[in-house]
Amino acid sequence: MKTANLRRIFETYYIKGGAMTPFYELHTHSEYSNTHLIDCINKINSLLDRAAHLGLCGLALTDHECLSGHIKALNHAKEIQQEHPDFQLILGNEIYLSQDVSPVTSENGRVSYPIESGQFFHFVLLAKDAQGHRQLRELSSRAWSRCYSYKGVERLPTFYSDLDDVVLPDPGHLIACTACLGGEFAKLTLAGDVQG
């Protein structure tokens, strides 16, 4: 889609009374989402440049269980803010939320977690502040400490109990979003389970 077409869409839907309605993209991926599965071709600098060019107020970088691009994104956002001082970068993470399960060690010594493939729910967490980013880092560290391979795909489960342990003692620093069709809410809705 050409820039002119995207600009027209934004002008049609997000500009009211001559002023831009604040719009933030809260779920984006970069080349850092490819640490365990090739997911995205967006480069961080290009992604941020494009968002600023389109007039977005900001965006959230929410790579798949990966915080490695945050420093690069912060540095480039500072450059963008020279021209667009109101542009905001929100640091986040798309985690794979799962029920707590005990690890299982196979005969060859490999550790895995008996989680069914469909029971990894995509869940986006956005840091509101430095404490929120610390919580993201702790949750990510826990998930990576459980990394295992299932049918050729790396799995990085974040357990519900991790959220309890990390977030509940000091709440209010993260914003949670349901993510995509891989999220629990979407899966329940698509299955017709309106009760949950």
Name these PLM-found stretches.
Residues 5-196:
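Phosphodiester-processing cores and adjacent nucleic acid-binding clamps
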